[in-house]
Amino acid sequence: MSECLMFGMDCEARCMTSMTADEENICFLVGTNNIKNDKNQVNKLFMDPEASRLMSKTFRHPAGEVRAIAAHPTKSTILATCTADFSSLGGTHSITIWNIEEDKRTLETVSRLPTEQVMSCLEWEPNSMKCAAMTPFRPEIQLLNMENGPEIVQNLKIPLENEEDEMFSATWSPHHDGNMLGVTGGRTAWCIDCRTDNEYLKIRDAHIHRTISMDFNPNLQHVIATCGDDGYVRIWDTRSTSSALTSLHPHAHWVWSVRFHPVHDQLLLTGGSDASVVLSCAQSVSSEQQIEFRDDEEEEEDDDLVEKLQDGQLERIDEHEDSVYACAWSSADPWTFASLSYDGRMIVSNVSRKHKYALMQL
């Protein structure tokens, strides 16, 4: 494992996103959720020019707790948050678009949409001004027009198996022009066609207890990954879902987040309640399943020896001391990833040189 960079925030935090609009600098946004409203903030974390330490710019979040955060796909000064303010009886909740005032170190409200319940998920579609938002307590996804709003333009109904089941996550497919949404709730994973509000795919009992998160393979449109509180990550072929293509068991407790590498889809990044971040390989079911690589000539007596990257755990980071709720790949450097634990600890790591060279066949 390569050396990690660490940064500690003043408050608890469980939501993080990469700044997709900044393709030159490694940069992430983190929102805190402290019960004391005046302490909550949005942190912009980035590398110093020598990439030797993490730097932070802090912006007070005046709307209370940050329950979800999304970065604008093309404008680095715009972000959106799902907010929760419990300073009054019953609390107030909203989805708010902010403009980052770098010089003033403030967040300027662009527009705000009050919501009846606290929203726990907010996903900006990469190629449009559309967002998906959800609450854990209602079986539906709200599609929002972020250009004139946030403004609700569509409600997608999710057919939960049991009324008491919670909704967990929503993820946009990169293959369907912003028309396909991956959703998890209860023990089930769905792919929903936003044009018809119809269920395109349903994987019942994807995990034993709860199916918490999912992601789409960036290179194979028929392959998805799910994770759950059974500690497993499962990879599925959406054309035949009677059984998973493969199952990995990288965590000893709940897995909160799973993310495919943006280029090399055999790499999977996960974070879990066992305070660990794991980089796994699923070479056998990837688009690059025939990849082979040469070991460094200085380390191998026979430079013609060719090996394959094997399925299973590649790297494990145990530098967190609390549940890891979020992990993300950098938009500027595909070999860099970040993880966030509930105690506010942010760790930025790199794929080790050994595995990087293996994937690049160097």
From Swiss-Prot:
Function: Plays a role in the trafficking of cargo to dense-core vesicles, probably through association with the endosome-associated recycling protein (EARP) complex. Important for neuronal function.
Family: Belongs to the WD repeat EIPR1 family.
PROSITE patterns: WD_REPEATS_1, WD_REPEATS_2, WD_REPEATS_REGION
Stated name of the protein: EARP-interacting protein 1
BP GO annotations: positive regulation of dense core granule transport; positive regulation of egg-laying behavior; positive regulation of locomotion involved in locomotory behavior; protein ubiquitination
Highest taxon, organism lineage: Eukaryota
GO (cellular component) term, any one: cytoplasm
SMART domains according to UniProt: WD40
Organism annotation: Caenorhabditis elegans
Pfam family, one: WD40
